[in-house]
Amino acid sequence: MANYCFTYLFYRWTNLITAPSLPATTLTLRCYNRMFQECSRLTNPPELPSTSIAESCYDMMFFGCTSLATAPRLPATTLAKNCYWGMFNGCTNLELPPSLPATTIAYGCYQNMFYGCANLIGVPNLPATTLQQYCYYRMFYNCQKIKLNTSNTVDYPTEYRIPPTGKATTNYSNSVSGMFTNLPFNINTTYYLHSSNVIV
C-alpha cells in the first residue's frame, strides 16, 4: 500500500451506503485520509483490522458521514502521529465510540476524533499513562450529550477517569485541552458521567 493511496477516494459520494472491504493490516502515511468524507448516506463502514498504523492514516476518514451510526473496531495498541485525527468529526448519528485500547499514544492521535458528534452518549476508557502533545485535544468537543460533573450525585453516578487506573504523566498542557465541552478536564482526576452516558 502506497502513501496517500485512497485519499479522497469516495469524497462526497452521497449514494454510498456500504463501504468496500479494506483488509490491509499494515498502513501507510495518509492512506485512508478523508476516504469517505461527506458520504452522507454511509451506514455500513468497513472493518479496519490493522494493528500496524501510520501517521494520519485515518485522518478525517469519516468526516461528515451524518448517517453513520456504528463505528468500526480500532484494535491498534500502539498509535502514530495524528492517526485518528478528526476520524468521526461531524458524524452526528454516531452514539457509541469504538473501544480504544492503545497504551502507547502519539502526538495528536485522538485530536478532534469525535468533534461535533452531537448524539454521542458513550466514552471509551483511555488506558495510556504517558500522554503526548495534543493527544486528546478537543476529542469530544461539542459532543453535547456527554455530560461530566465533578461530584457524585444521583444524576451523575459513574466514575470516569484518565487513566482508569494508575497515574498518567504529560509534559504538555494541551494534552487534554478542550477535551470535553461542559467543563475543564484534568488527568488523574475522578469525574462523574451522567446516567444517560456509558463507558465502552
PLM region spans:
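Structural signature of tandem-repeat unit edges
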Residues: 1-2, 11-29, 37-55, 65-81, ...
